[in-house]
């Protein structure tokens, strides 16, 4: 953290970063619920993202000296715990990032302020069609802070070493054949892919290719037992054939990237992950491409995920314009993008992305390329996770553990997953 940023942080909050987290988790804000007129801004991430955003907030307040910003941040899990506490106390930050599984949960809890016509909010970079796509059930109550899509990432260095190339038109069948062949024949004993049926966005793409949706418009689980079973079965065939890392090699169902990154040719991921994860193995070149497709994939299966942020419905009227200006800064500022980069996804503002591209890192340019490629595809509507579904990934991991331990068949695990998720939604 720069000296300027540290001074600004202490000026904004009056306490250190650990105190911010501790006070927030206790249900009381370091900014006194904005009682001093500060705009409270909450986000998640590691130390590098925290520093980048603090530096960006320096730039924002330099341009808007009349606006004070009180930052609140933590890692992803701590952020969600803090938000739960703040929701219960109705002490929510003025502007806040929204975890993917909580978009409708937060809406149903009444956290979002309607942004239609909000003074200070600049949406001039977006078309009317884009703005319509941002709405939830017709209401403009959240905005995308970044966007990304599922991809297949691969180690281009490993491919070159073997004199190999991925199939030009990737299908689930020909990718499986390729991974089996690579695992059996590469000179260094690497595996074709890390065991990854826990990857949520590739899973959703797989379902959509089968004509299903992960979530339906009316807030139900759209995935069928057959759809879930087909997904797990694709992975299990590879695992049993030795084409994936073993559970011991990746230390369980959900490995960290440093555990497996030099052991595999490919991994499924989100399009933005390459920015940070490639840095873990600087001696290798990584690239990425669209996920495989069924030969008879349902039309419009592609999707772009909006990572959203919002303004709290309880922001006092006299602070709405300042909060909206901070949101506009997040949407439109080249300076902010130059500081935070694309590790959290590409900006939804295409003009901003065009401006940034000449200075993007090589890995960020790969994010830009796939973002533009997928933006050109046909995309049918995608629906957010309903209230009560926030634990669905853990439920999937639980069933995958049962399968890999030999304690459940794939059909039984798929049925148990569907039953458990439906039960949690019904009980919400």
Question: For each predicted feature, which ranges?
Answer:
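N-terminal secretory signal peptides and thylakoid transit peptides that target proteins
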Residues: 1-20
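Extracytoplasmic "Venus flytrap"/periplasmic binding protein-like
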Residues: 59-126, 161-163, 256-266, 280, ...
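Extracytoplasmic/periplasmic substrate-recognition and gating elements
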Residues: 62-63, 160-162, 233, 240-244, ...
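A structural signal for short loop-to-beta-strand junctions that line the ligand-binding cleft
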Residues: 93-94, 122-158, 191, 298-301, ...
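Hinge/lid segment of periplasmic solute-binding proteins
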Residues: 100-149, 173, 287-289, 375
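Long, aromatic- and glycine/proline-rich binding clefts that accommodate carbohydrate-like moieties
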Residues: 129-134, 289, 342-391, 395-398
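Extracytoplasmic/periplasmic solute-binding protein
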Residues: 141-145, 150, 173-222, 227
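Glycine-centered hinge/linker elements that transmit conformational signals in sensory
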Residues: 179-180, 219-248
């Amino acid at each position: 953290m720069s000296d300027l940023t540290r001074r600004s942080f202490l000026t904004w909050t009056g306490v250190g970063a650990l105190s911010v987290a501790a006070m927030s988790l206790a249900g009381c804000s370091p900014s006194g619920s904005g009682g001093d007129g500060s705009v409270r801004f909450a986000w998640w991430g590691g130390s590098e993202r925290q520093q980048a955003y603090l530096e960006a907030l320096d730039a924002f307040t330099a341009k808007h000296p009349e606006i004070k910003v009180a930052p609140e941040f933590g890692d992803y899990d701590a952020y969600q715990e803090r938000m739960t506490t703040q929701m219960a106390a109705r002490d929510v930050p003025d502007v806040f990032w929204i975890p993917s599984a909580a978009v409708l949960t937060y809406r149903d809890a009444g956290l979002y302020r309607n942004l239609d016509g909000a003074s200070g909010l600049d949406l001039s970079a977006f078309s009317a069609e884009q703005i319509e796509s941002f709405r939830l059930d017709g209401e403009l109550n959240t905005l995308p802070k970044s966007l990304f899509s599922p991809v297949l990432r691969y180690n281009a260095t490993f491919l070159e070493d073997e004199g190999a190339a991925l199939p030009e038109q990737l299908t689930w069948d020909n990718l499986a054949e390729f991974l089996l062949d690579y695992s059996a024949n590469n000179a260094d004993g690497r595996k074709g892919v890390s065991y990854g049926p826990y990857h949520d966005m590739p899973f959703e793409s797989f379902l959509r290719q089968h004509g299903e949706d992960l979530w339906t418009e009316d807030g139900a689980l759209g995935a069928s037992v057959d759809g879930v079973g087909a997904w797990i079965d694709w992975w299990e065939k590879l695992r049993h054939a030795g084409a994936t890392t073993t559970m011991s090699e990746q230390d369980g169902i959900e490995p960290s990237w440093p555990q497996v990154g030099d052991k595999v040719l490919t991994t499924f991921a989100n399009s933005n992950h390459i920015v940070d994860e490639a840095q873990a193995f600087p001696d290798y070149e990584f690239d990425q491409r669209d996920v495989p497709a069924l030969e008879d994939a349902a039309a419009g299966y592609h999707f772009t995920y909006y990572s959203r942020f919002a303004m709290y419905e309880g922001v006092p009227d006299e602070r709405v314009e300042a909060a909206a200006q901070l949101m506009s800064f997040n949407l439109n500022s080249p300076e902010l993008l130059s500081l935070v980069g694309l590790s959290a996804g590409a900006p939804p503002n295409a003009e901003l992305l065009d401006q940034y591209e000449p200075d993007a890192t090589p890995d960020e340019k790969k994010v830009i390329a796939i973002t533009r490629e997928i933006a050109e595809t046909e995309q049918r509507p995608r629906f957010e996770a309903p209230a009560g579904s926030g634990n669905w990934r853990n439920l999937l991991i639980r069933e995958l553990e049962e399968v890999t331990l030999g304690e459940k068949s794939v059909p039984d695990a798929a049925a148990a997953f569907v039953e458990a998720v439906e039960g949690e939604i019904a009980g919400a």
